[in-house]
């Protein structure tokens, strides 16, 4: 079956106001504004890899350091110049609060909105022709860069964008203004659509991280993007709206959610090739260009295409194989056959083929036929590897056939996509032969990670040991005052049908300003996360509980089993300082029939702390919840 596509490159060219712009922005995120990396060296390597755009920032706080006085920092112009002279197009983010307006919170007052707009205007005027791509905020919905202020609302963001967009277009009518990079999913994005965000931007920003869903193939991302297009059509009169994926990546940290360099390279290659089949996608920015540090267990230190000292990683070479090609290429044809996706691109006057194997556990042998008469040798390139020359002629010697077919060529594609270039205009796919090759059966060295702590879960009626919460994570400038500020302990028992938890919290100030359990994490509350031993990384059970308006409230955020089995929750106040949470959590919620002696669960427990000025931190037993979701950092529950 064949499908033919015409890439809507003209739409983007019209937006960008110049024929020199790429068909597609193959980009990478940098952190020059955070004083990370060396712009000249980083950008030289980015250009060598064929990357045509970088995404960086110059924050409001750095520009307006005295109220009413806007001064563009020198580093901004320097990294712009370094990028532009290498043919790299910067995408610049306008972001984050300023302490002179609304106390540093999300800009909402008229004064703050005006201040933010002035800052944006100053950046656009300063950048001039060096920048055509701008994004109004980064992860407004996720709280990035806004420590202590929680997450922004759809209403607040659309109000901001309505203020800023027309003023920027007046200064730079050819600029492409991209909306906030939504990171919490389609629900928030759709809420902004309802509020009219599509009328106040030239393109939609979206972040699509799924690396914590360890067994999720790139094809699931591709399906998600197709569904995103349908969502846009439903609010845009059945028409496309350009979309930029301004962050996507697979970090190489040593954790259950980490990918090996080889896995990241494979995912990168498949991701960019799939992206080029979607005409509404105008750019995809890999996060990150450079590792942020050397901590092998920390995701942010291991997202890069290159190490912290610029040593290339395997994904860098995959990017080098594809970036220059895909940024200028036009998709001519897409063919699917027997689990193969074969893409035919035109880049200038030449064509090239890209083969993607979509069948897990199988390698695909591809037989090509030259229907012309040239028999020119072709260039074969496994993405990320050195190209080599292949001449025509195929002998099926494994089937004991002696004859050579002079106008045929055989290549095999596994997980990593494969490229064929040269005189391929009259080259056609003749046959696809599957060969079983299940890489999940490869014997690999297994690492053993022992939990940092464990708790015994005793049968109901027996006195369980009280386990203290020992780690406080500070999120704002308000310092943790020790045990007199916040302390907690828990006991765990069980019946065959349920896990029984009692958490006793002593807090010098109890404050819960929220009216809904979904956002109760912003105030004094608890969050629990569990995983059954041997479960896939992405499958876990998460529970929130809080005292809201004097009444207990509980919700299930995620479940390994029957989500309708909501835990019973009783919360009691003991004087001014003590709150006790009693939870009965059904075994069925974990996907278990019953709890028995010898059973084990991994899990983490968290106490949120708000003394009246926002969520200032949390106390935890175990990690992997509160900042990043990582069941590999949970502690252990042992049922006695």
Show where each model-derived region lies.
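Hydrophobic h-region of N-terminal signal peptides that target proteins for export
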Residues: 9-18
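N-terminal substrate-binding region of glycoside hydrolase catalytic domains
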Residues: 20-122, 135, 141, 470-473
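Conserved, mostly hydrophobic/aromatic
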Residues: 54, 83, 123, 134, ...
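Aromatic/acidic polysaccharide-binding cleft in carbohydrate-active enzymes
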Residues: 250-319, 335-337
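Carbohydrate-binding surface patches
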Residues: 336-384, 577
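C-terminal beta-strand-rich structural cap/linker in extracellular carbohydrate-active enzymes
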Residues: 394-437
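Structural preference for beta-rich elements and adjacent junctions enriched in aromatics
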Residues: 433-640
